[in-house]
Amino acid sequence: MQVSDFHFDLPDELIARYPQEERTASRLLKLDGNNGNLADGSFKDVLDLVEPGDLVVFNNTRVIPARVFGRKASGGKLEVLVERMLDEKSILAHVRCSKSPKPGTKLFLGENDEYEAEMVARHDALFEIHFTSDQSVLEILNSVGHMPLPPYIDRPDEDADKERYQTVYNEKPGAVAAPTAGLHFDDKLMADMKEKGVEFAYVTLHVGAGTFQPVKVDNINDHHMHAEYVEVPQEVVDAVAAAKARGGRIIAVGTTSVRSLESAAQDAVKNGTELVPFFGDTEIFIFPGYEYQLVDCLITNFHLPESTLIMLVSAFAGYDNVMGAYDHAVKSEYRFFSYGDAMFINKKTS
């Protein structure tokens, strides 16, 4: 398939620049992957769509304030966007400035040059930066960093984004983009789901800035995914086995939860084992033709045209069904992307 097969026209006014006042106030488009049937609703309908015995899998990554402004020792301004933390003192990052810094270049970060760092090495498009200040990377980012809103939101971050560009169940710092399907859940909805007899499990995938990078090839088979760190612990393995045994569905909240679960499943297939814990980088690329191993239902936002994420969803529910759903969503003026509306999708099984 060609990347252009996943194109759709999206009016600029349908890109959500701010979240709804309440997390659960978003709209929800329901898609049956077996027949393409659509139903419009509200995100609160999720409570009616889940059943006792289902297992809902969330990504508990926490978004770090990964965008930092500063200058080079020569005085030139720069912007650093963390891709991932390497250790307590070092990061891999995208750097925007008039002239790329060379190894050994001193950097001063923060509005008042609060922190000093050094550019150590370049790895393709990414720069390895080591902080020479006493504080850890996380302490520095929490002090002078900004929330890394996606480029299509096209506004400076605000104080409210520190809460709203973060799930209510976030736990492990490391993401530089939110697992956006999870932004719709609030404490009440999750408590109501628990009361109904729904089980929860938590994977971790630290979303990288690469999630916003355009696919630069024509044929999707030629695309190579960026690496992201994943944790699928023993508790998740046990919860999946228990849900399958009782006939419950595995419902993934977001494409990051899907990629975490399916990475563990692919690893098990490769090693000829049952599902086991998975800790490490994944470069899994899911597109039409992929056979899902674990996930039965998917809750996800509306994704960018020609992105790897709309390809993943198309593999889950069928290409024609998904493109038809997106056409309906545009005509029905759903809100798109990170702060936008969501879908609840049953997997195509036939």
Curated annotation (Swiss-Prot):
Pfam families: Queuosine_synth (PF02547). Gene3D superfamilies: QueA-like. It catalyses: 7-aminomethyl-7-carbaguanosine(34) in tRNA + S-adenosyl-L-methionine = epoxyqueuosine(34) in tRNA + adenine + L-methionine + 2 H(+). It is found in: Cytoplasm. Its EC number is 2.4.99.17. The keyword Secreted does not apply. Pathway: tRNA modification; tRNA-queuosine biosynthesis. One of its GO terms (cellular component) is cytoplasm. PANTHER family: S-ADENOSYLMETHIONINE:TRNA RIBOSYLTRANSFERASE-ISOMERASE (PTHR30307:SF0). Belongs to the QueA family. This is S-adenosylmethionine:tRNA ribosyltransferase-isomerase. The lineage of its organism: Bacteria, Pseudomonadati, Pseudomonadota, Gammaproteobacteria, Vibrionales.
